[in-house]
């Protein structure tokens, strides 16, 4: 799953990921995961802009297509990451739109429940909550002035 906001705090969580039936975290080093993968995913949008010299909109469009595909047609029992209003799970404030693992079926989604989170995961999720709440406060201020 990829938790949180699209941006520098985005957190690719491999805790429950598997590769050919093996836990993904058993196939990589902690150093590579923490110091390479997480920062690379978090900076992906800006890296695309820098490499291509223009917007990463095509990448965002592909993500939107995948998002709608899974939502409408289902994710076949597999987890997908979607930005959805939180129901309060995992300490994410209720109503905050947040990327989290879901399973899609019949045009609906259900947040994956009861995952055990370690402190590393909780810290990254908390950083995303702070970033999104800061963005929401900025928007609220702009709207109040309008």
Task: Cite the ranges covered by each PLM segment.
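Long, compositionally biased stretches enriched for glycine and/or charged residues
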Residues: 1-146
């Amino acid at each position: 799953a990829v938790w949180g906001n699209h941006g520098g705090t985005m957190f690719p969580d491999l805790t429950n990921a598997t590769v050919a039936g093996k836990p993904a975290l058993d196939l990589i080093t902690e150093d590579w995961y923490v110091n390479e993968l997480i920062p690379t995913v978090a900076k992906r949008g800006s890296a695309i802009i820098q490499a291509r010299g223009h917007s990463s909109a095509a990448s965002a469009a592909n993500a939107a297509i995948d998002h709608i595909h899974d939502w409408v047609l289902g994710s076949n029992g597999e987890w997908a990451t979607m930005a959805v209003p939180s129901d309060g799970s995992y300490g994410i404030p209720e109503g905050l739109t947040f990327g989290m693992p879901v399973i899609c079926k019949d045009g609906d989604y259900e947040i994956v429940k009861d995952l055990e989170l370690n402190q590393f995961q909780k810290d990254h999720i908390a950083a995303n909550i702070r970033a999104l709440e800061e963005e929401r406060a900025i928007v609220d201020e702009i709207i109040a002035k309008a």
